[in-house]
Amino acid sequence: MAFVIRPARAEDVALIEPWTQDTFAWGDYVSDVMGDWLNEPGSLVIVCVYEDDIPVGMSRVQLLSPTEAWLSAARVHPEHRRSGMGMAMNAFGVAWAKEHGARVASLAIEEDNEAARSQVLKSGYRLTGNWSYATASMSTGRRLGTGERLRPGGTVDADAAWTFWAQSDLAHAARDMISLGWRWRRASRGDLEDAVNAHTFYQSPGGWLIAETDGEGISVRWLATSPPDAPLLVQGLRDLLRDQPGEPRVEAMVPVTAWSVEALQREGFEVTPIQIFSLSL
């Protein structure tokens, strides 16, 4: 019996939840956000079903820019793995992205997920970026002096940051991409201006970064610094947590360079390697 792929519907959310609860050691998030995804423009959620029309696979594709698509949230019911659903959903998502103007489709995989890496390479993807997902709790040491701390920056600061970053090894390692949480697309000068307007663009003698706050801490999407200045920037990032309530944590997506991982680990960050794969359409 062959499975078919169709667009997801609101009633599929409750049917997907039981077999996605143990995807990771901490659970899963897809059933909590899938309902919202169904209503997002430029986004498609698909499911795999058999004759009973009960979802046993799911995936999402979305346009992050007019020419860039991102594929994520691929899940297959444990009893239906190795059935070809993963590759079939990927192909379906890629076709949808191409029809909607995308010229490249990308996705992220943790470096130690050999099965997923093998699958995307067989599908024609190539490795286009190595990143570090870095997390840390609030610093317990001395707070930085006023002149060393991160503070909100303005348009002039963003201009300097962009000029510096565009010529840096961080930009080269990032392939000029910016993190949108667990999604990536090509960065633009406008991203920094948006951050200035949202009061999420910060500067210090150690460099510049975009840091967004939520109920659990701070998330860093983009940063610009140099090897000698990186320690001060990272210290300043942890220092920002002192102004957050509860027991906040900081998470940062940082391109892998010859020095970036060491700078993070020296300041107590736990680092998980992430790889970005892309497919030209």
What role is predicted for each listed range?
Residues 13, 20-47, 55-60, 169-201:
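Active-site rim helix/loop that mediates acceptor-substrate recognition in acyltransferases
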Residues 54-62, 70, 75, 203-213, ...:
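Conserved beta-strand in the GNAT
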Residues 119-121, 125, 262-265:
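Conserved active-site tyrosine of GNAT-family acetyltransferases
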Residues 174-281:
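Charged, low-complexity intrinsically disordered regulatory/assembly segments
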